[in-house]
Amino acid sequence: MANISSPFGQNEWLVEEMYRKFRDDPSSVDPSWHEFLVDYNPESTAEPVLTDPTSTDKQPSATPQAKPAAAADPVASRAKPATTPTVANGTAAGSAAAPAKTTTTPPIEGDELQVLRGAAAVVVKNMSASLDVPTATSVRAVPAKLMIDNRTVINNQLKRNRGGKISFTHLLGYALVQAVKKFPNINRHYAEIDGKPIAVTPAHTNLGLAIDLQGKDGKRSLVVAGIKRCEELRFAQFVTAYEDIVRRARDGKLTAEDFAGVTISLTNPGTIGTVHSVPRLMTGQGAIIGVGAMEYPAEFQGASAERIAELGIGKLITLTSTYDHRIIQGAESGDFLRTIHEMVLSDSFWDEIFRELSIPYLPVRWRTDNPDSIVDKNARVMELIAAYRNRGHLMADIDPLRLDNTRFRSHPDLDLLTHGLTLWDLDRVFKVNGFGGWKYKKLRDVLGLLRDAYCRHIGVEYTHILDPEQQEWLQQRVETKNVKPTVAEQKYILSKLNAAEAFETFLHTKYVGQKRFSLEGAESVIPMMDAAIDQCAKHGLDEVVIGMPHRGRLNVLANIVGKPYSQIFTEFEGNLNPTLAHSSGDVKYHLGATGLYLQMFGDNDIQVSLTANPSHLEAVDPVLEGLVRAKQDLLNKDTNGNQDEAFSVVPMMLHGDAAFAGQGVVAETLNLANLPGYRVGGTIHIIVNNQIGFTTAPEYSRSSEYCTDVAKMIGAPIFHVNGDDPEACVWVAKLAVDFRQRFKKDVVIDMLCYRRRGHNEGDDPSMTNPYMYDVVDTKRGARKSYTEALIGRGDISLKEAEDALRDYQGQLERVFNEVRDLEKHGVQPSESVESDQMIPAGLSTAVDKALLARIGDAFLAVPEGFTVHPRVQPVLEKRREMAYEGKIDWAFAELLALGSLVAEGKLVRLSGQDTKRGTFSQRHSVIIDRHTGEEFTPLQLLANNPDGSPTGGKFLVYNSPLSEYAAVGFEYGYTVGNPDAVVLWEAQFGDFVNGAQSIIDEFINSGEAKWGQLSTVVLLLPHGHEGQGPDHTSGRIERFLQLWAEGSMTFAVPSTPSNYFHLLRRHALDGIKRPLIVFTPKSMLRNKAAVSDIKDFTEIKFRSVLEEPTYEDSIDDRSKVTRVLLTCGKLYYELAARKIKDNRDDVAIVRIEQLAPLPRRRLGETLDRYENAKEFFWVQEEPANQGAWPRFGLELPELLPRLTGIKRISRRAMSAPSSGSSKVHAVEQQEILDTAFG
């Protein structure tokens, strides 16, 4: 028989069984055993040689030195004595193996005799041999409650994510290995070399696991396989090695190496209920650790669960250490068990394990029970519930990268200990006042629901909301068991992920190096957006309008809006759509589109559109809001005051994390959310949180905890969600839409994800963010991880997943081939926009006197009982007088223009800071009751004809928030959504319009050229030098003229009320869809010379060039004129007054009322009337480097040869628009007049 001191110990039976199989049929044994078995002899008496640890001759100890021999009858065989033994493990040196003995009790007739073979025979031998090892056993009872609770936390987290389970043996085995590091003697074993006793300390800890196997015949057997070099393994690696050994044991794939070299063993008889066991110690080992069953102390096993919880009784687990007393002493063994005991109760042990398993939560802590009364603890449980509602998001597992894996997601307010609660309270019942639908509940269940609601893959912030109803609604939706999507819904989510990833992969493969700002790393936003749109369709809404930055835009165009792939790929191929040849165009990731969304699991459909945007991040935000408001106003569904119908167009806004926190226009736009003139019934905000802004990490780009904190200013609920969990993303999207529909408020979704590539496809992010991209480069994408989860749950098969992706890639490939075959259009230089748009022939902007009278009457038609402010009443009376008698001033001329348009069926929208009254108290478009504060809007009376029938027109006037960027963007967007509306925005002073410069540059001036996007927005910019300082002087004419080209806008500086009247009406009626910039007056508002007669409103039209009235009426003689002063705006009146004062009939003053497009023909005709003029001057108030001169000085001589040599009269060139001193201003102004007439 085989030597009982074999290195395989109690596994020897398995080795012998394999040998017999190998002998009969080598192919029946795993090839990894062949080398070992080819010269193995189960009857060899030679024992393995244990090399002196100090020897340099390394001999394998795992392979016995044996000679081939015939197998003997196992019943009659005897173990042969060793001839020259060199090692004796567990016996005296030089002793021979004892002969086999027979029982001293003879069998009784009828007894069944069975020869013990294989494992049973080896057990007999091993147990007999173990009697020669002088052992002792230490026993220690260890509290198991902390292990139970923390294991529950771990396994619940694993179940929600990648699957798998951690056993108590995993935990205790790892603790054993860590304890061995502190007590290396426990890992030693006894040997004799050359007759000398030796304590062998192995170089590594090789932990033997006793694995119970069941054979095909149903018989059970035990093998002990070793996890090698355990001391080098971290917990996750230890678990992997453990599971690998067990799996291969059960699959019959263990090798000889797995059995050899075990230094310490772990056995777990507790799995069959044994509480306390003293296992036998095999030769070659110094100790074996036994783990008993987890049980309550015997005296409490009859107690109820409630009583046990009340008393704070926990289960115990008994650990035994059976050790070789020759080399290990009892104190060492006892201290070893004590160390394991302390370790499994320590904070550091569990912190390490949780970090290793990427459990983002703090482990349960071992603490003594708090004896406070149950009444006091009821209050503390309610405090805990409130804390989770308020701070639970800080504990949520929302970061797919987990870059700082040493930091737990926690907060002191969420710690049981902070509230005077411990793990002993988890099974106690407390009063919870209806939380979760319960009146009373165990703290364990309460804590579980709180964590499921607020701390998993979704973190919710809502306690900053002031409305209790909204808070309660969110609690009811969040604090409930989440319903798992159906298999069909899961497959649909997977199909959207497949579509998103396949699209990016295809483009990356086919168009290497092209910038496309891919969505890779954030693919879950596609099923998220799809779910939100689907939910909008479910609510029966009309349209979802999307505004977003460039990252992921192509993917959204393809997979959300439904833009044809062939069109997208054609743009990549460099083909030019001939229908776009009139525009300069823009890069492919800025373009917009429109599509129709059909519900997958419903019968509704909904319009989906994506607005065009520039690269200026967040600039599209207010534009989107204005566009949506215009669409809502056009639908006009709030006629019955039903808000559910009024806001049937939904804005969906995508952001980047760095931009949302960093761009001020975000806060400006959020501030519009609940204002009457700007409200759209709630915006769905989705932040694609890449956790980086180009190369800047969050800690360098914001001061707040989250990038979303700015949204708290409007009481919007905020949902943080892990982008690696598409099901959570879909759930949050639906919840967000439901909240928006219920409360008509903004909702913010913060989807934490990552950016697979650099800022663009040519960027290497590892240069500046190496650690992040070390993580990103090895991270599996959302599609793969979700596919694995579905397959692991058995929802779909691997083949189904692969087939779905292959099919989608095949579709893209086919489209690509189609694009290759398309007829290519040669890319030609842009013909640009049509600069010379002709005003329709016969267009009349004059109105009937009766309409002027109606408008004048409206200002005195105040409701009965309405009290007009005593300072306003004269203004209203004067307006009625002007409507009948003339001498109409600027403010009333404007109201006449707007009122007449309302009467003609136009929607007129006027907004700006203080616009209802007017910055200079000139407008009074809305009258406020002196006593009640009620409003009366006279021009709204024009919405009905004299017979009471509606005209279809509407007058809307709003005081805007103190904003330029968002306010101008909103009004621009409104004109995109309703091109027929007359939309005017007025700056408080023209100087402040530069706060909206991005909107002017990117949308107003170039939107048509880039995207074919038309706008009729009107900007009213108070402008003029009046000694009020550099910030209350200039609307920056020079900047607008520098931007102007190709007829992109119309700029005008009207100098008479009637010309302003006709300018506004022409803009509204001529059909030309271009923005209008009007530089309006300030001091001229009350200039008695700046008035117009009624016939100027009823008989003429807008005149782009004006002569002095004395020449137009043939009072003065043009032939006397030798000097012509060209000017614009209110300076005309100062020049005219000086001319009269100096009696200069040799000087003529010509006003250019429209600066761009320059009225070249009309100006030329006007100048030709002054045949004797020799000198031409451009006279302006602005400094030489500002105003119209920088452009006119170059342009006028080119367009009109007669103006060659034209000279400038102005202030000197200045860095600021004007002097800060009114006295200096007066001197400069006088100098201009003196020079003009010098």
Curated annotation (Swiss-Prot):
Family stated for the protein in its record: Belongs to the 2-oxoacid dehydrogenase family. Kgd subfamily.
UniProt region (Disordered), positions on chain: 44-108
Domain writeup: Is a fusion protein with two major domains exhibiting structural features of an E1 and E2 protein, and a short sequence stretch of E1 localized at the N-terminus, which is connected by a linker region to the rest of the protein.
NCBIfam families: 2oxo_dh_E1, PRK09404.1, PRK12270.1
Region Succinyltransferase E2, residue ranges: 98-346
Reaction catalysis annotation: glyoxylate + 2-oxoglutarate + H(+) = 2-hydroxy-3-oxoadipate + CO2; 2-oxoglutarate + H(+) = succinate semialdehyde + CO2; N(6)-[(R)-lipoyl]-L-lysyl-[protein] + 2-oxoglutarate + H(+) = N(6)-[(R)-S(8)-succinyldihydrolipoyl]-L-lysyl-[protein] + CO2; N(6)-[(R)-dihydrolipoyl]-L-lysyl-[protein] + succinyl-CoA = N(6)-[(R)-S(8)-succinyldihydrolipoyl]-L-lysyl-[protein] + CoA
Record region (Linker): 42-97
Gene of this entry: kgd
Protein name in UniProt: Multifunctional 2-oxoglutarate metabolism enzyme
Keyword Glycoprotein in annotation: no
Residues given in the record as acetyl-CoA binding sites: T1050, R1066, K1101, S1104, Q1154, R1161, R1162
Low complexity: bias regions: 59-107
Stretches the record annotates as 2-oxoglutarate dehydrogenase E1, N-terminal part: 1-41
EC number(s) on file: 2.2.1.5, 4.1.1.71, 1.2.4.2, 2.3.1.61
Summary of activators and inhibitors of this protein: Alpha-ketoglutarate dehydrogenase and decarboxylase activities are inhibited by unphosphorylated GarA, and allosterically activated by acetyl-CoA, the main substrate of the TCA cycle.
Source organism per UniProt: Mycobacterium leprae (strain TN)
Residue numbers spanned by region 2-oxoglutarate dehydrogenase E1, C-terminal part: 347-1238
One Gene Ontology term of the molecular function aspect: oxoglutarate dehydrogenase (succinyl-transferring) activity
Required cofactor names: Mg(2+); thiamine diphosphate
Ligand binding (2-oxoglutarate): H590, S615, H1032
